[in-house]
């Protein structure tokens, strides 16, 4: 039974890839529309449960009226049908409705809807461009995805379940009052009007301050996670106090915003408490007056008094429910600002998989400047023949890594074209493009998973023999065999920590090289691939790199010019343009920028260009 209800909302539905709406109501409908049958069933269960709950007070009043009659041996016989119906509703129907309601909410909606929404949001956010993640804290983005899923579910459940329950409960109470004497309705109607005025005044203020507090919470979370992520920097520079002040500033801001939010809540709570006092006093006083005049029975007094006390007790819950709804809506609004952003790099509707036959690459009059007015790369033309190995050289900021980034389509060009085997990469799928290019960067970042998982990222279907062969070529088997993590996992099963922090820079680089060896893509990009290796290890794996580069088109970047001097051709860049091209010997003879860079490095001034 539990499993059946838990299967009503699948957590991993098909992903359509559409951008979520940027307005609140369409955003809710985007995620709630597919699960409407479950929400409708919950609404109906809540309706029936509210009717039964109110009926209990009616039954109580009826029993009091029965008891007020003259007792006799035929009492149970005279009231058998009515008492039997009350017993059925109380002992059988009500528990069934409570169970059904709880199964729908707790087994289907709570775990299903929130995690389903998170999965869909994550699937969209993870497709954002590199600049999206560079412009925000990773912790803030993750917090918004997680919190938005929770708040969307909570507010949806409260609106479908709790608010509907409140409306039906109050409406039925008014009906029962009218059945006894229409004048009993007056205090409750006046209370409802006063309650509505209170909500109209306080709720918009609560909503606004909840949104502000949610934004401050995401900011504080981002700063805390940023500090944890960069803990080595914090330790090395001994700025613990400064970092604490940086985090404290955001927490103080959160505290101020949170206090402003709770002031509204406290004011609303106090005002409702005053109005509730008038409701109880007015209803009880009016009921006694009507009874004294012979207009209602003792049972009606019991019904009226019991219902208003129940409504009084519910009023706090109603207040928190409505306040919670708008607080959750505020959190969802905050999440929308991050989650519902258009994708700056996305596949065209008619995009096709890239087919690499030879591996030739052409850059045709490309312009790219990160959305600014100019700079970085301007009017660059370059042809890399199939199987050719070129080295990109130039001072820092020349545009070398940017050229690689646009080749990988981490960013889209402002103008121009990049062709691979004659196919414009703007018209192929991003996934197929990156599957055909192996990359080793200078800043190797590993996933907080096992060594094996990180290696298989290069080729998920690789056999154990293929995996170990790649590791051996990268000269990584010796240190992998000695690894033990905090959970006692060893070797290939040892976890490497966040971003691979448990490994040295050289060890991470060798894992990255092994991963690309395993991928065996036809086009290879080496961005300072051996920068983190010592000279002995670099020399040891150079033969493996030469083997890896065999038959492939290679684009290599290195500040250490000796590592790429053997390339077929060197391309010298400066300020986003190609200023020289040729072999090492030709460029030295030309006496240009490359010759000056070479002279500085061989003269002992390598740091000047790094």
Where are these regions (language model features)?
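Loop segments that connect adjacent transmembrane helices in multi-pass transporters
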Residues: 136-139, 212-260, 332-334, 338, ...
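Cytosolic ends of transmembrane helices, especially the final helix of ABC transmembrane type-1 domains
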Residues: 216, 239, 263, 311-340
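ABC-type nucleotide-binding domain
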Residues: 354-610
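Membrane-integrated ABC transporters
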Residues: 1-53, 67-87, 101-109, 113, ...
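Juxtamembrane helix-loop junctions of ABC transporter transmembrane domains
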Residues: 10-21, 52-61, 65-68, 90-134, ...
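Alpha-helical segments in transporter systems
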Residues: 26, 37-62, 83, 87, ...
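Transmembrane helices of ABC transporter permease
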Residues: 34, 38-48, 93, 158-212, ...
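Hydrophobic alpha-helical segments in the permease module
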Residues: 86-98, 192-196, 265-279, 285, ...
């Amino acid at each position: 039974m539990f499993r059946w209800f838990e299967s009503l909302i699948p957590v991993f539905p098909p992903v359509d890839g559409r951008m979520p709406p940027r307005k609140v109501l369409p955003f809710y409908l985007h995620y709630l529309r597919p699960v409407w049958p479950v929400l409708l069933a919950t609404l109906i269960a809540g309706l029936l449960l509210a009717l039964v709950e109110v009926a209990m007070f009616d039954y109580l009043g009826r029993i009091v009226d029965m008891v007020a009659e003259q007792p006799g041996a035929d009492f149970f016989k005279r009231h058998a049908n009515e008492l039997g119906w009350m017993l059925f509703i109380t002992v059988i129907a009500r528990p069934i409705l409570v169970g059904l309601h709880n199964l729908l909410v707790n087994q289907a909606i709570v775990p299903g809807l929130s995690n389903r929404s998170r999965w869909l949001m994550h699937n969209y956010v993870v497709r954002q461009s590199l600049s999206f993640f560079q412009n925000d804290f990773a912790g803030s983005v993750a917090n918004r995805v997680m919190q938005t899923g929770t708040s969307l579910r909570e507010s949806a459940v409260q609106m479908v379940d709790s608010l509907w329950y409140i409306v039906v409960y109050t409406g039925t109470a008014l009906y029962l009052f009218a059945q006894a004497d229409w004048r009993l309705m007056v205090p409750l109607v006046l209370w409802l009007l006063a309650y509505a005025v209170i909500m109209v005044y306080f709720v918009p203020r609560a909503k606004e301050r909840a949104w502000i507090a949610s934004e401050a919470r995401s900011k504080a979370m981002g700063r805390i996670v940023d500090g944890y992520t960069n803990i080595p920097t914090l330790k090395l520079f001994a700025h613990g106090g400064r970092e604490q002040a940086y985090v404290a500033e955001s927490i103080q801001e959160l505290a101020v915003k949170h206090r402003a939010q709770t002031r509204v809540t406290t004011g609303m709570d106090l005002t409702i408490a005053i109005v509730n006092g008038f409701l109880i006093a007015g209803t009880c006083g009016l009921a006694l007056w009507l009874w004294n005049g012979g207009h209602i029975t003792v049972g009606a007094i019991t019904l009226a008094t019991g219902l208003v006390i129940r409504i009084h007790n519910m009023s706090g819950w109603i207040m928190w429910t409505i306040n919670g709804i708008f607080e959750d809506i505020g959190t969802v609004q905050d999440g929308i600002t991050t989650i519902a952003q258009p994708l700056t790099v996305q596949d065209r509707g008619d995009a096709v998989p890239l087919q690499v036959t030879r591996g030739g690459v052409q850059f045709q009059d490309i312009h790219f400047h990160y959305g600014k007015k100019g700079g970085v790369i301007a009017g660059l033309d370059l042809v890399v023949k199939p199987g050719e190995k070129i080295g990109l050289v130039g001072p820092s900021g020349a545009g070398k890594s940017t050229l690689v980034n646009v080749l990988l389509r981490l960013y889209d060009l402002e103008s121009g074209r990049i062709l691979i085997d004659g196919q414009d990469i703007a018209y192929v799928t991003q996934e197929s493009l990156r599957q055909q290019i192996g990359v080793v960067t200078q800043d190797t970042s590993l996933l907080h998973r096992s060594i094996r998982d990180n290696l298989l990222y290069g080729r998920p279907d690789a056999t154990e023999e293929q995996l170990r062969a790649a590791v051996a070529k990268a000269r990584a088997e010796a240190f992998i065999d000695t690894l033990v993590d905090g959970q006692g996992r060893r070797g290939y099963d040892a976890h490497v920590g966040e971003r691979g922090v448990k490994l040295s820079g050289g060890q991470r680089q060798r894992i990255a090289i092994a991963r690309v060896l395993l991928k065996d893509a036809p086009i290879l990009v080496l961005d300072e691939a051996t920068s983190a290796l010592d000279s002995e290890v670099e020399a040891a794996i150079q033969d493996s790199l030469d083997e890896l580069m065999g038959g492939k088109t290679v684009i290599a970047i290195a500040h250490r010019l000796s590592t790429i001097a053997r390339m077929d051709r060197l391309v010298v860049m400066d300020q986003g343009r190609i200023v020289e091209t040729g072999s090492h010997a030709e460029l030295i003879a030309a006496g240009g920028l490359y010759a000056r860079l070479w002279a500085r490095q061989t003269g002992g001034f390598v740091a000047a260009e790094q």
